Amino acid sequence: MMKSRFCPSPTGLMHLGNARTALFNYLFAKSKDGIFLLRIEDTDVERSKETFDLGLKEDLRWLNLEWQEGPGADEGNGPYHQSKRQAIYDDYYQRLEEADQAYPCFCSEEQLRLSRKIQRSAGKPPRYAGTCRSLSAAEIEKKKAEGLQPALRFRVPDDEVVVFADLVRGEQRFQTNDIGDFIIRRANGTSPFMFCNAIDDALMGVSHVLRGEDHLTNTPRQLLILQALELPVPTYAHIALIVGPDGSPLSKRHGSRGIKELRDNGYLPLALTNYLARLGHYYASDELLSLAELAKGFNVESLSKSPAKFNAQQLDYWQKQTVNQLPNDDFWEWAGSELQSQIPTDKADLFLTTVKPNASFPRDVAYWVNVCFGKTLNLETAQSELLRATGNRYFEEAFEAFKKFGKDLNSVVSHLKEKLNLKGKPLYQPLRIALTGAEHGPELAKLILIMDYETIQNRLQEACQ
């Protein structure tokens, strides 16, 4: 059975890049009637925190990316926290050492740094020089007796080529002479990502590894490990990373925010999944799609090799589409029941049909609740200056027109046009700003029907001051 996986490290909050990787793996699994697995890679003991672990799971559930295997689900291949799997890794270290495919390395960080510096100055790529590769058993025991704690290095075969087919990038070839022997166990006994990640994928039956292109150079090393241990090898696919509009790595200065922050600001999960699913993946449909529909249209061959540029406006577009299709009860649950309670029952339906198409966030709903039912508007300086420049006569005539025609906006506007000889923006804009405090928004005629007549009068009088 096809099985994909998402393997976050609980060293921080989930960001858009993490979320997209999780989403693609989820959609990939669902498109093949496969299994989506969650594994927590918490081998970085100092930086891994339980709060981040819980936060990652909460974010995944909020995005409706439910895993079928992993913590709290099917745990048949567990444990699913790497910090609890050290005995498993130790067993495979022993196998590699016994087969002479791994050896202890006593080189200090300073020695390694100097070696890399010499290699770079000679125009060579930095790789391990093999200082400890041929130590005899006696030399190894002597160094251990001196109290030196060795790391463990994988013995990379010379003069070979590692070849694999990447589902996104096609055939990939790596010369083993360019790789060099690499560390698979640190001197303190802990396991680095590269080793335990490969072991766990094999033991947990992961058939497809879909991850960021920043892991591409890890793949030949992991293939060498798996082949040496005669473990099953998954199929790999390396997706392009998300970058800012300027092509630089995505950061907060581009408007990128963590999933928790987006959720707290009122973004909806379906908006996020519709945006992220199209960020580096082509969909023929430009309509809002359910997760099931996104999965049905997902194809690894439709993943782009080029970096995916983050666009905050596109994210907000999908947010607006999602809000617009919310059932009324869900809309109020999202916007807040305290806002709903401020709306008279007899005006609730009209308010909803008027405001909903113009709302992207709960703060938008709160704004229009205040416009329709609040006492005062907080005008910006430029708006106040525009009202002053319009002159009192405009608002006096508007006041009289509302008295004469009631809430018939067309008649009010015709009256102003006739009395003041105005047209276009000078005719409409001052009235909209005086009544709503905004230059754009829902249809003014409908907003006027929602407002109390007294509110309309008061705002026109305030505009005259």
From Swiss-Prot:
Its EC number is 6.1.1.17. PROSITE patterns: AA_TRNA_LIGASE_I. It is found in: Cytoplasm. The keyword Aminoacyl-tRNA synthetase applies. It is an enzyme of class 6 (ligase). A motif ('HIGH' region) lies at residues 8-18. Keywords: Aminoacyl-tRNA synthetase, ATP-binding, Cytoplasm, Ligase, Nucleotide-binding, Protein biosynthesis. This is Glutamate--tRNA ligase 1. It comes from Coxiella burnetii (strain Dugway 5J108-111). The gene is gltX1.
